[in-house]
Design a protein with these regions (language model features):
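Extracytoplasmic beta-strand/coil segments of soluble accessory domains associated
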Residues: 95-136
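A beta-strand signature from Gram-negative outer-membrane beta-barrel systems
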Residues: 149-190
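Flexible loop and strand-edge segments within Gram-negative outer membrane beta-barrel domains
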Residues: 228-249, 257-316, 322-340
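Membrane-embedded beta-barrel scaffold of Gram-negative outer-membrane proteins
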Residues: 315-329, 447, 455, 489-547
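Gram-negative outer-membrane beta-barrel transporters
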Residues: 415-418, 517-521, 541-626, 704-706
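C-terminal beta-signal and adjacent terminal beta-strands/loops
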Residues: 523, 565, 616-625, 650-707
Length: 707
């Protein structure tokens, strides 16, 4: 018996030393072969980290812990997040997956609909290209709510790249890309169930199962349901703090893998109902302000890869996707109906001439159609029970939009061992609205020694703005909604970046230190302006300057066996010209800085895990306040900094685990998330100026089962 413990101790020491040694070098990416096009051109989480196979010593299981995040190995600066990192928090959906991430912020757009967006490099998530399995996804009206459309238990990993990304996936990446890597049919066969509940009356159930039908065929099904059973108004302003929400989500995915041909395909459907507005228990009136959003979404995709030469990674791949997004929305007496359709296809050829030279060329086409009906600026209030009266219907206007954009790209990558990787790419596209446009991008990574990596990037990005669809949540405001009569131009920006990563041996372990700077310069931008007219929210083309400077430094260190800490600080300088070119000022509702500290500890046998995150979010500016009828200011010109703390404890068993935790444990809430709440039918009603949490402390518990 005594000899067993001696051997166990020796194995743990050897594992820890190996971990420190291996983490001095960066992760190794998959080669630029068919895996890039069809299976995943990001690094699989199982191959990114230093992985130690479980050693079984009679009934004692030795586990060496791997990191939950790792840096992407190529020329593009980015990180890969695997399930170990996602399990550090409840991670009910994509929007809740970045709690422990220093680079990505997630915030509510308004206090009534629950619309959320990410911010990367100090700018809104509209400038981040969203991908699922490396296919562009979630466009137009899906943007404000897309973070809730990807259940957390469905995700195998997330890859976040910063700056202009590869031209292979299109021209839309301005500040970066976020790619969601779903669970795969070809993964180890298992059934998983995840149940979740919190103190805000939210419950969730998730299930997934995959089957290997043969040595070539595999399939899986993913299921999700969530429901907020009871609305609440904790701040007493007469409005629900968060909308009621019920969602059903399902996907079926298939794989065929032969020697020279690989197929991936799948179908998905989502149904979601959101209800919000005034709390009938606290507002004693027959004239209740209500918000209702009914969404139906259907999507499908196919990926075909033909492997022509295994030795050189020569392959041809065809990838396509289609989606239909239907939205019926009511914001008080305003109605917005949408039927949005998207088709995307790309044909890719890749080959490695030698181990040093890789070429990727391809063609693509993207088509968007938005059938819209809205009564955006109706001012008369309908009588109770007359919301669907012919009078209101006569105010509905059709505003259809469509765009078709075919294009071609070429990308060359030069790799000199582990010392140098240079990637240059160009795209040429033609928009049926804006005509021809050219997209150059360049990335280089240089490692003079194994412990240092330097990355430089420069590139251009473009984006078509579907103003009403993307900003339909602004219809909740009491102001009128105005989009420039000349039409919104294509957004256009340059992005430049530099980052340096250090791997420093320290006390027998490795300190990972990263510093980066990014500059985004807009040549044209759709400006959302609250300042030009107090009675309007105006969206118009940029008249002047708009830019973002972002500096970030972060460090992580395994303080002791099983304990890893991370600290980060980010500084944002984001400015835009408002009031139709008159004033260059800070971008409203954007924090000037963010500091983050995380600690994660897993016991030696892997039975218990403790995670904690502390955030300090810096203050910033609000839109220009104005004087109300009573002589007071509509709101403060600035908002102040605030802290947030979250924590979770997980107990692991052989085939299941339980977790309990809490979010926003400091209890901080934005004091007035809804301005003018006492009169939602007036022009001073404003629920869209949210800069902080709208709910207080929340506690939760859940169970994960797999067999």
């Amino acid at each position: 018996m005594y000899s067993r413990y001696i051997l166990l101790s020796a194995l743990l020491v050897i594992g820890a030393e190996t971990y420190a040694k291996n983490n001095k070098t960066e992760v190794v990416a998959l080669s630029s072969s068919y895996n890039n096009s069809v299976e995943n051109n990001s690094v699989d989480s199982s191959s990114q980290d230093s992985i130690f196979k479980d050693e079984i010593l009679h009934e004692v299981k030795v586990v060496a812990r791997k990191s939950g995040t790792s840096r992407l190995a190529g020329a593009v600066n980015g990180i890969a997040v695997n399930k170990d990192e996602l399990f550090k928090a409840a991670c009910c959906n994509l929007g809740e997956s970045f709690t422990t991430n220093p680079s990505v912020d997630v915030a509510y757009n308004d206090a009534t609909t629950g619309a959320r967006q990410i911010k990367l490099l100090g700018l809104s998530g509209t400038y981040v290209q969203m991908l699922t399995e490396n296919l562009p996804n979630f466009r137009g009206a899906a943007i404000p709510y897309a973070l809730g459309y990807v259940p957390g238990p469905w995700m195998k990993g997330i890859q976040v790249s910063k700056g202009s990304a590869s031209v292979k996936n299109g021209y839309e990446s301005i500040t970066g890309q976020i790619n969601v890597d779903y669970l795969k049919p070809e993964d180890e066969q298992q059934v998983e169930v995840n149940l979740f509940g919190d103190t805000k009356s939210r419950i969730e159930a998730n299930a997934d199962a995959n089957v290997h039908l043969s040595d070539k065929w595999a399939t899986e099904i993913l299921l999700h349901h969530e429901n907020i059973l009871k609305n609440h108004d904790d701040n007493g302003d007469g409005f629900y703090d968060m909308p009621g929400r019920e969602q059903y989500n399902v996907q079926n995915r298939w794989l065929y893998k032969g020697k020279h041909y690989i197929f991936h395909g799948g179908l998905g459907a989502l149904k979601e109902i959101r209800t919000s507005g005034q709390d009938e228990e606290h507002v004693h009136s027959d004239d209740i302000y209500r918000i209702k959003l009914h969404t139906n979404r259907y999507e499908g995709y196919m990926k075909h890869a033909f492997i022509l030469n295994h030795e050189h990674g020569t392959n041809i791949a065809f990838m396509s996707s289609a989606s239909m997004h239907q939205l019926d929305a009511q914001y008080g007496n305003r109605f917005y109906n949408l039927n949005e359709k998207n088709l995307y296809g790309s044909l890719i050829f890749e080959t490695n001439f030698t181990h040093q030279h890789n070429l990727s060329v391809g063609l693509s086409v993207n088509h968007d159609y938005l059938g819209q009906r809205a009564n955006v600026n109706v001012s008369p209030r309908p009588a109770v029970g007359q919301e669907d009266s012919p009078y209101l219907l006569s105010e509905m206007q059709r505003m259809n939009e469509k765009e078709t954009t075919p294009g071609a790209y070429a990308q060359y990558t030069y790799t000199l061992g582990t010392k140098l990787t240079a990637m240059a790419g160009v795209r040429f596209d033609h928009s049926s609205i804006y005509g021809n446009f050219f997209t150059p991008r360049f990335h280089v990574k240089y490692s003079p020694v194994d412990a240092i990596s330097i990355r430089l990037s420069a590139g251009k990005g473009y984006r078509t703005v579907f103003g009403l669809a993307e900003y339909n949540y602004l219809l909740a405001s009491g102001r009128e909604f105005q989009i420039t009569g000349d039409g919104l131009k294509q957004e256009e920006a340059w992005n430049y970046g530099m980052s340096t990563a250090f791997y420093i041996p320290m006390f027998g372990k490795t300190l990972k230190l990263n510093a980066e700077y990014y500059y985004t310069d807009f040549k044209n931008q759709a400006v959302v302006d609250y300042d030009a007219n107090k009675g309007l929210i105006s969206i118009y083309n940029l008249m002047g300057k708009s830019y973002s400077h972002t500096f970030q430094i972060d460090a992580s260190y395994p303080l002791q066996k099983g304990l890893e800490i991370t600290a980060a600080y980010r500084l944002n300088d984001v400015k835009c010209t408002y009031d139709y070119g008159k004033t260059l000022k800070e971008k409203p509702l954007t924090s000037k800085y963010k500091a983050l500290f995380t600690a994660s500890y897993k016991t030696p046998l892997g039975l218990w895990q403790f995670d904690a995150t502390v955030q300090l979010n810096g203050g910033g500016s609000n839109p220009e306040p104005y004087q109300l009828a009573d002589g007071s200011q509509s709101w403060s010109p600035r908002f102040h900094s605030f802290e947030q703390v979250s924590a979770q404890v997980t107990r692991w068993f052989r085939h299941w685990s339980i977790y309990v935790g809490g979010e926003n444990l400091t209890g901080f809430k934005q004091k007035t998330p809804i301005y003018g709440a006492s009169n939602p039918w007036g022009s001073d009603f404003e629920p869209t100026l949210v800069w902080g949490p709208v709910e207080g402390r929340m506690f939760y518990a859940g169970v994960r089962v797999h067999f």
